[in-house]
C-alpha cells in the first residue's frame, strides 16, 4: 500500500511541447524576415550588375528582364574607351610652395589610358593612403591617451569624443579653407588628410591600448627600451586586431566618402570612380547601361573586400568593445 501511495503522490514530469513549437516558429519567422531584408538590400546590386551586361533595348524595355536574355560587354567597352589621359597623375604634397606660380606640382606615371582606369587608380590610392596614415596616427594617439599621463589628457579625449558627433557638413567650410590655404585643393591629398585625423580611429585604438598591461611597458623601460622600440615591439603587436578593424573601416569609409570627394575635387584628372560615375551620368543621362557599368565598377570591389575581411572586422570591433 505504501508503494502504491508513493506512486500516486509522485507527479509526472511536465513537458512543454508547445514552448518548443513556439521557439521553432519564432526562429522560422526570424529567418524569413532576415531573408526578406537581405533580398531588399541585395536586389539593387543585382540589378546594377545584370543591367551592366544588358543591351540598351533590354534596359529600356517596358517589361523588365530579371535575367539578361543576351549578355553583352558593350557598356564596359564604352566605359573604358573614353577620353585618354596619363595613367596616373599625382600632386606633390605642398609642392606649390616651391613652384613659381604657386600652383600644385604634378608628376605623371605610365602611358595614356581611359579616364575610367585613372579614376579607379585615384580611388585605390586615396583609400590605401588614408588607411595607412590613419592607422599610424590613430595607433600612436590612442596609445598616448591610454597609457601616458599628461596635463589635459581627459579634456583632450573628451574633445575627441565630441568631435565624433559632429557631422561633416559642420566642419566642411573650415576644411575647405584649410586645404585652399595649403594649396591642396583639387588634389587627392585634400581628401586624404582630413581622414587621417578621424576621431573614431583614435577612440578605437585607445580602447585597445587600455588592455595593454602596464607591467609590460614598465619592464621594457627597465630593460632600457626606447619609447619607439616599446611602441613597435610591444604596443603594436597587442593592438593588431584593432589596427586590422580600423584599416578595413577606414578603407571602406574613404572609398565611399562621396561628399568630401565632391567638394575637394573638381578637375577630371583628379576624379575618383564615384565622381566619375556622376560625371558620366551628367553627360549620358539616357545611357543607363554605361551608368550601371560604372556603378558596378565602383561597388563590386569594395563589397568583395568587405566580405573577405568581414570576420576580422567584426572580431576587432568586438574585442575593442570588451576591452573598453
Q: Where are the model-predicted features located?
A:
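Short, Lys/Arg-rich, polar N-terminal cytosolic tail immediately upstream
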Residues: 1-21
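A structural signal for multi-pass alpha-helical bundles of membrane permease subunits
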Residues: 18, 26-324
